[in-house]
């Protein structure tokens, strides 16, 4: 059979990296798409775990990984992060092997547990203090996060580690963990760290009443964020991203499974199943997950949810489809420079990429990717390891999938295996200018462009009197130009969605974050094949206000991006111009097509329509040939696609409706 081969990212985005040590031969009979088996996963995990050994403190309490920047929690917390996150990988490795531990991982992490909890400290730095001591949880908030990995690792390896420890060590460890049971300082997925600590303490028979209360509080809190179709909002907001898989499903479903609580598993496991039904469509045929949302340096933590579905049986994926997805993604990162020559995971996507990071990102943050190794809990004979790989959705059909609960539209094409995501429902927890959420579209092979280069910049073409040099234009963005500066997309307000379309509204914001009073933008995306019809209805803007639509940010050796004016973009005769979009995880220098227009004098509402396309096909037909768009009445958009099928959508001040 013919098997798609992993696509290569641009050379500039693919630093030389090793494949985490010696890998076994490929098995193209069992794994025709990736060649990988469980042995490849074991070798990858072992390579990652052995590579961090030189950076351990004298008694293994901290793992102080190299890096140009510490997190805002400080170097001691970063060292705890190195211990906790790699311990989780070791726990998956040993527990899934029935306790076999030829590399001595548990002895090392057991020594670190004893040393780290012996004399916990409050100071964030490492100078002049016990080099192995852990930070105290009430004083170091990040330690709450890491307590979950410590507790889960201990729970998974309890017969081989916890049950063998000295009573004094266990008492100290419990004392260190207990504060994590309290309500968290951040009202989002952080509630689940207490749940995870509580689950371990319940298993260990320690402080069971307090532990159960923490579990119950956490489940009650996240239930209020469940929006249906397998999607949680990460707090009282509209934040939908990969935290659904690697936190909001990961912790409660794994807790229910380890507890043997069928009632809990029936509830949370079925939510996981629903989530995976759409989530599986977000993976490129080359293995890449969707670079959308925060904490993308966690990379293959995106595999936590698919593996969890296989572990618990709550999944729409067959065993062979699960392994093909998971092995495709892990191999994609290993093959594309996500592991350094020293065997470490740097801060970035493929290689190092600083613009992707958050303030809480430190040298050990990427090891949250350990969650993606959850599949190692499945024994050798599990069908997920033994059945023949099956293709991904992106390899079998062109499809546009509407995820109504999060307001996302997932568009995939089988000819190139490329996946695009159109965002009409998710907003950043950090503010409207965050490019990881604020763009209208994302894909598995592009952007977004870097925040410091692309948000609300001054454009000298629109403001000739300015002496500021333009740097880069935000990709996949629709903006008004106010005093020459592009407005940002305010918090996203979903207007509706249906087969092949999704719509939202926002209030544009200036560079300082202030809103444009009285101005609203209603936006919609209609998708079919590789074609996207992008629609924006502007109300409340002064006549003559410039507007701008941008397309996909691509490097010279990337996929082909196209943008075609349909209505409202009158500058330059409606012809797109090419502008720089700065760096992305896929290339240091990218560019995008750009359309310009102005708000007309007469109508109360101004409509702007374009056709966009992103494709890896060779010599693609122009975007204008992909759809015929006709406007009628009160902002009704009628689309006849290239294959003759049709779509209709009407935008109003408050709604988006389709027949």
What are these regions (language model features)?
Residues 1-127:
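Extreme N-terminal leader/anchor segments
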Residues 79-80, 88-94, 102, 106-307:
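Aromatic-lined, polymer-binding surfaces characteristic
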Residues 80, 144-146, 403, 526-530, ...:
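Solvent-exposed loop and beta-edge segments used for protein-protein assembly and interaction
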Residues 84, 148, 409, 534:
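Residue-level detector of short, conserved catalytic/binding motifs and their immediate flanks
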Residues 95-99, 162-163, 381-382, 544-547:
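Short, solvent-exposed secondary-structure capping/transition elements
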Residues 120-135, 284-428:
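Carbohydrate-active enzyme catalytic cores, enriched for enzymes
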Residues 388-452, 634-637, 643-657:
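Beta-strand-rich N-terminal accessory domains
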Residues 445, 451-659:
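Extended repeat-based interaction scaffolds and adjacent low-complexity, acidic/S/T/P-biased segments
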């Amino acid at each position: 059979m013919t098997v798609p081969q992993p696509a290569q990212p641009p050379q500039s985005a693919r630093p030389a990296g090793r494949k985490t040590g010696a890998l076994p031969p490929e098995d193209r009979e069992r794994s025709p798409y990736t060649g990988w088996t469980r042995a490849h996963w074991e070798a990858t995990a072992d390579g990652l775990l052995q590579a961090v050994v030189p950076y351990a403190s004298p008694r293994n309490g901290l793992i102080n990984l190299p890096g140009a920047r510490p997190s805002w929690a400080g170097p001691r917390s970063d060292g705890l992060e190195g211990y906790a996150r790699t311990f989780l990988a070791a726990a998956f490795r040993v527990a899934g092997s029935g306790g076999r531990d030829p590399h001595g991982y548990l002895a090392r992490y057991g020594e670190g547990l004893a040393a780290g909890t012996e004399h916990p400290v409050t100071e964030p730095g490492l100078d002049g203090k016990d080099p192995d001591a852990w930070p105290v949880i009430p004083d170091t908030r990040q330690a709450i996060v890491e307590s979950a990995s410590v507790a889960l690792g201990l729970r998974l390896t309890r017969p081989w580690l916890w049950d063998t420890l000295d009573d004094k060590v266990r008492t100290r460890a419990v004392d260190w963990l207990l504060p994590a049971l309290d309500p968290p300082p951040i009202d989002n997925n952080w509630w689940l760290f207490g749940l995870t600590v509580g689950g371990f303490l319940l298993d260990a028979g320690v402080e069971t009443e307090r532990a159960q209360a923490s579990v119950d509080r956490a489940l009650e809190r996240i239930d209020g964020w469940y929006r249906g179709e397998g999607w949680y909002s990460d707090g009282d907001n509209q934040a939908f991203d990969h935290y659904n898989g690697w936190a909001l499903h990961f912790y409660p479903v794994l807790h229910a499974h380890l507890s043997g609580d069928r009632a809990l598993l029936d509830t949370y496991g079925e939510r996981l199943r629903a989530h995976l039904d759409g989530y599986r469509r977000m993976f490129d045929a080359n293995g890449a997950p969707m670079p959308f949302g925060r904490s993308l340096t966690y990379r293959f933590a995106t595999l936590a949810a698919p593996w969890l579905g296989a572990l618990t049986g709550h999944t729409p994926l067959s065993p062979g489809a699960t392994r093909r997805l998971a092995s495709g993604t892990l191999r994609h990162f290993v093959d594309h420079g996500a592991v350094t020559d020293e065997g470490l995971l740097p801060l970035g996507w493929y290689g190092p990429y600083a613009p992707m990071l958050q303030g809480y990102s430190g040298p050990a943050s990427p090891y949250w990717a350990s969650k993606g190794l959850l599949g190692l809990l499945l024994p050798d004979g599990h069908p997920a390891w033994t059945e023949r790989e099956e293709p991904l959705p992106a390899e079998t059909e062109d499809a546009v999938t509407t995820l109504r609960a999060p307001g996302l539209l997932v568009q995939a094409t089988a000819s190139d295996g490329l996946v695009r995501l159109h965002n009409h429902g998710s907003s950043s927890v950090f503010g409207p200018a965050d490019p990881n959420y604020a763009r209208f579209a994302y894909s598995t092979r592009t952007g977004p462009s870097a925040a410091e280069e692309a948000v609300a910049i001054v454009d000298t073409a629109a403001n000739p009197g300015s002496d500021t040099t333009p740097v880069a234009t935000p990709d996949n963005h629709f903006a008004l130009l106010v005093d020459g500066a592009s407005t940002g997309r305010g918090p996203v307000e979903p207007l509706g969605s249906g087969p092949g379309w999704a719509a939202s509204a926002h209030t544009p914001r200036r560079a300082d974050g202030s809103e444009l009073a009285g101005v609203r933008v209603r936006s919609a995306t209609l998708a079919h094949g590789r074609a996207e019809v992008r629609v924006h209805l502007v109300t409340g803007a002064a006549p003559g206000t410039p507007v701008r639509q941008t397309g996909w940010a691509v490097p010279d050796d990337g996929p082909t991006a196209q943008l075609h004016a349909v209505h409202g973009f009158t500058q330059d005769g409606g012809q797109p111009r090419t502008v720089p979009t700065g760096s992305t995880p896929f290339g240091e220098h990218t560019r995008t097509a750009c359309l310009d227009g102005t708000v007309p004098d007469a109508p109360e509402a101004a409509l702007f329509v374009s056709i966009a396309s992103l494709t890896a096909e060779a010599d693609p037909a122009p975007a204008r040939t992909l759809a015929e768009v006709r406007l009628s009445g009160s902002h009704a958009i009628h689309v006849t696609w290239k294959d003759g099928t049709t779509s209709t959508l009407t935008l109003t001040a408050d709604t988006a409706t389709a027949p």
